[in-house]
Curated annotation (Swiss-Prot):
One BP term from GO: symbiotic process benefiting host
Lineage: Bacteria, Pseudomonadati, Bacteroidota, Bacteroidia, Bacteroidales
SUPFAM superfamilies: (Trans)glycosidases, beta-Galactosidase/glucuronidase domain, Galactose-binding domain-like, Invasin/intimin cell-adhesion fragments
Protein name: Beta-galactosidase BoGH2A
PROSITE patterns hit by this protein: GLYCOSYL_HYDROL_F2_2, PROKAR_LIPOPROTEIN
Organism: Bacteroides ovatus (strain ATCC 8483 / DSM 1896 / JCM 5824 / BCRC 10623 / CCUG 4943 / NCTC 11153)
GO cellular component: plasma membrane
Gene Ontology MF: a single term: beta-galactosidase activity
Enzyme Commission number, as recorded: 3.2.1.23
Record carries keyword Thylakoid: no
EC top class named in words: hydrolase
Amino acid sequence: MMIGKLKYLMLGGCLILGSCLALGGCLMLLGACSSSSLVSPRERSDFNADWRFHLGDGLQAAQPGFADNDWRVLDLPHDWAIEGDFSQENPSGTGGGALPGGVGWYRKTFSVDKADAGKIFRIEFDGVYMNSEVFINGVSLGVRPYGYISFSYDLTPYLKWDEPNVLAVRVDNAEQPNSRWYSGCGIYRNVWLSKTGPIHVGGWGTYVTTSSVDEKQAVLNLATTLVNESDTNENVTVCSSLQDAEGREVAETRSSGEAEAGKEVVFTQQLTVKQPQLWDIDTPYLYTLVTKVMRNEECMDRYTTPVGIRTFSLDARKGFTLNGRQTKINGVCMHHDLGCLGAAVNTRAIERHLQILKEMGCNGIRCSHNPPAPELLDLCDRMGFIVMDEAFDMWRKKKTAHDYARYFNEWHERDLNDFILRDRNHPSVFMWSIGNEVLEQWSDAKADTLSLEEANLILNFGHSSEMLAKEGEESVNSLLTKKLVSFVKGLDPTRPVTAGCNEPNSGNHLFRSGVLDVIGYNYHNKDIPNVPANFPDKPFIITESNSALMTRGYYRMPSDRMFIWPKRWDKSFADSTFACSSYENCHVPWGNTHEESLKLVRDNDFISGQYVWTGFDYIGEPTPYGWPARSSYFGIVDLAGFPKDVYYLYQSEWTDKQVLHLFPHWNWTPGQEIDMWCYYNQADEVELFVNGKSQGVKRKDLDNLHVAWRVKFEPGTVKVIARESGKVVAEKEICTAGKPAEIRLTPDRSILTADGKDLCFVTVEVLDEKGNLCPDADNLVNFTVQGNGFIAGVDNGNPVSMERFKDEKRKAFYGKCLVVIQNDGKPGKAKLTATSEGLRQAVLKISAEEL
């Protein structure tokens, strides 16, 4: 390995089982090595339907005979907190979204056929927040405190054949605050019931790496873990077949050996792929590895794994390289909530997030600050995102009163093990993060006695030199860092390990350990140019940048005045507007503007890229404000999924598509001085016109990624024209809007899948008589749905709104709001009607079709 360069040859894909969406991927059933007509005994069923739920505790609900007839019937995934009211009294605080917590119980009754006696049944949870305990027929199967980890239990010894079985789950999210952002409450990710024969591939039981790759061939290393849960030793053959995207076999191998009773055995194999198609950002090509376990002519198991082949390296001088091409990671950080849907996982909602980001030019996701839903990584595999996969937000030292720190010593190895095994086959995952802004960076940093808001802020200000590691010192915190990195490398030596650090000094205990492969800074732009000198031969990435603050649709002038909010971390901050300007002139004291980071990354080859804080607004952490603010201002896109103006800055810098974005709106007081900004690309110059009169030609330069004019408002039109070599290539016009007159409904899709889960996100706009958006409209819009659909949620992107997310009405916020329609599980049409007092109503029809 070259000094200062980390080179990696990767990699496999996410784990696929049975016939539905599996842990991290799509489910398929494919043959391998021999007759594809042989049926695998493996089945994996969606176990989300028809649960009963009760919010409250003190029950004997674990017992199978408990009467739950009056409990609510619902389908998972489910987040009970998002259904509640915002309140200053909720112990989650504004940092946790000011939504309720509590204890909840879930119960499901099911039966298993006696013909399946001898099969192995497991219940698999993708994530339960938090402190879950699972019971089958009154028997406790175990507890899992960490709310972001996937886990499973063996049901087999406790099942009753041809009789009712009762699965009960207690979820305890009563002790709060336990998170610095909105966590959600309940079984908020998918649940699966798997059935296998006694000899089968273990959970997350394949591991695919690439030992070499060039244009002619790639050599894949396979490790398959088999479990023999029978009473006898068995001679088996593991057949591994790699298939291309069209289902054609491109490589095959087989190995035979003995699987001892009651034990696991690992089969190692190698495949050679001729003329491999590489996984890349723009062409995320996926193969499928089909693993078949045979005993003579009997198929004991069939298991599939999507595989992506690619190479990447991180270099201390040249940054990030993917498949031999120097590439900047243009990434964003993302928390896990889905706006008005809360934490409850929905594949289409996650896909929408990623589509909006991809259109912006984003190519990277940082999973902040916890293991993500498997569906997110599966989508990143298929859509071409570079993922920084993160394990923890805290280690032993807590950031909030009741967070994971109290479980860390007992549970971190188990959780880290399950996290790495689950995610290590995803081609999108290129780096592990073992922590974010952990207090172990310093010798003695405690947040025990601070409020949640103060704890968030103290993390991002400097600490005295006495709290840093001394030269040659091997502190407890450095030793813990070494332990965690060693643990990760033992499970996956193919990827680098980093941590998001907000102490840039080389005396940072994590840095002093010497084991982090990549130096990662959260913020501290002024220190970044010194990284090559302070950390020679270490690759570098900005793990978190900016923390710029914006409210969609709100503008504070003059735009060249910078607002640094909050003014002090130890004092409460308030501004009567509870808003932040969209001019790129407001950020936190430890952060910076979007333009500053874009230029820094552009001008320094050693910077591998950045993950902007954040791609979307999220519930909770409403910095710089406290109550009644309850969601963030950090996003490039607001909570409802509406891009803020800065979205088009990134689009102009990160893509080659034509961009011409003029803002703000053109509804002001006559004679008022207005700052008009423009983001553009693919042009030499832009010229602004007010009612046909030129306001001058402007050109960007290396120091300014936007242009601006200060003009006096007069009703009419403001227009910008972009020219390339003197030729007009684009133009944008904004008209002064009149009084609100009508509603416009715009769906993101007109045809849904009739699966009971698919969603249509409908943008609701208030227009004047001429069809212009009314930029200050706040009309209350009422919704009704008839036919095959229902309202899954409503939003408008307002961080201060006290309106419920689960409702049939929403006020417009700067002219817009959102209604989300969910299919009811049947094919047909749903008719959405939107009404508002004094406005013409709008009607939209949405179709749903069977797969």
